[in-house]
Amino acid sequence: MRLKRWEIALLASLLAALLVCAFPLQVQSKLADKLTRLHVLANSDSEEDQALKLQVRDAVLAASAGQSVLDDTLLNKLEQAAQAEVLRRGYRYPVAVTRETCYFDTRVYETFSLPAGYYDAVRVVIGAGAGRNWWCVIYPPLCAGMCERDWETVAREAGLTEAEIGLICEAEGYVLRFQLVDWWGKLLHKLREI
């Protein structure tokens, strides 16, 4: 059976699209293996619970400062710090700190952005965990206010390659690639939910 010209053109276009998508997807996957994100969920969307979420975030970031190994001992330390902050602020909400693989949409921070995808995450759930959330990168320590040095230096020391650093900090050149990664990531995320 012989293919028609339009069929050949269609197949060539599909192959080209797959190749264009492959590089950013590969870089995102390798990047995700080197980062641990922090995900803090408030009890509710009330003004008080949202303020508490940020106070708990600060306590967790302070407790994680200088740590390079994310093990059960550190998770327990983070949970104790979060629970102590909740109690100190006069609330009786339970706090759960877990390590999970979570799907994150593309996120733009002050000095860099991360493509959508699955990342290792430390999840801090305050009370019902039904409120708006907050996230950043806990390892390497790239959260605003957490990193006292140039974040690119910290990223290099954590093992990120120049291509990975370029992917997350060159916003203009990677907008299309992030959209492709987002589209592909959302499709895979929806397929996993089925």
Predicted feature residues:
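Sec-exported extracytoplasmic/periplasmic mature domains
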Residues: 57-65, 83-91, 144
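Extracellular glycan-modifying ectodomains
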Residues: 2-12, 162-194
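Hydrophobic membrane-insertion alpha-helices, especially the h-region
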Residues: 7-24
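Soluble extracytoplasmic domains of inner/organellar membrane proteins
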Residues: 112-176
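Mid-length scaffold segments of soluble, non-membrane domains
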Residues: 73-137
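Charged, low-complexity intrinsically disordered segments
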Residues: 4, 9, 28, 84, ...
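Short extracytoplasmic
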Residues: 37-68
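Aromatic-capped interface at the extracytoplasmic side
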Residues: 20-34
